[in-house]
Structure formats: C-alpha cells, structure tokens
Regions:
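Non-catalytic interaction/Regulatory regions outside core domains
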Residues: 1-111
Length: 111
C-alpha cells in the first residue's frame, strides 16, 4: 500500500485463488460487494490460468492490466505459485506500480 497512494487494494492469492493476504487503503470505499470482489478475483485467476496454457509458445505472462472507468486492475505473478491482484485509482501510474511489484517479487525469489 505504501508503494503508491493511488493503490486501492492489494490481494495475494495462490494459483487456485486461495487468498493469502488482502488489504485496502484506509478511507477507500469498496465499489464491489464482498461476493463481487471474490468473483472478480476468481475470474482473474481463471483467466490467468487460461493464458498460462499458451506459455510454452508465447512465453510466461508478465501482467494483465484492465482499465475501467472507475479503477485499473493489475494481475501479475508473484513468485512461481502466487498472483498479486491490485486495484488502483484510474490516474495511477500503472507502469511504475508494475515495475515495483516485479522488483519486489524478484527480491523475494532471490532471498
């Protein structure tokens, strides 16, 4: 959360969608209900799995950015067995956030 003030929410889950960590920025109003949030995460995990089936031909996915009117959603690998799911304000610098998450994941892999 301290990475960028435009981050609304961060969730880390395994590749089956089991939530390992989740937090919202203080003062952020949820746009989705709890059930809708779980469904959105489930859809993102399933979409990531589908894309991963092509990795042997096109390479491993680095990230997916969904740009909506009210938020941006970033889904990307966090190590070999987890995904990070981040929502931001629309004006967020997603390239910076993606770069920082990639660096953090790499430092954890090398620890």
């Amino acid at each position: 959360m301290s990475l960028d003030r435009n981050i609304r929410m961060v969730t880390i889950c395994d590749t089956d969608g089991k939530i390992m960590y989740s937090d919202h920025r203080p003062g952020v109003t949820n746009l989705l209900t709890s059930d809708e949030s779980r469904k959105s995460l489930e859809m993102a995990v399933n979409a990531w799995k589908s894309r991963s089936q092509l990795a042997s031909k096109i390479g491993k996915g680095k990230y997916v950015l969904a740009d909506y009117e009210k938020i941006k959603r970033i889904t990307m690998p966090f190590g070999d067995t987890h995904l990070v799911y981040v929502t931001t304000e629309p004006q967020a610098n997603h390239a910076y956030i993606i770069s920082e998450i990639t660096s953090l994941a790499s430092s954890l892999d090398n620890a």
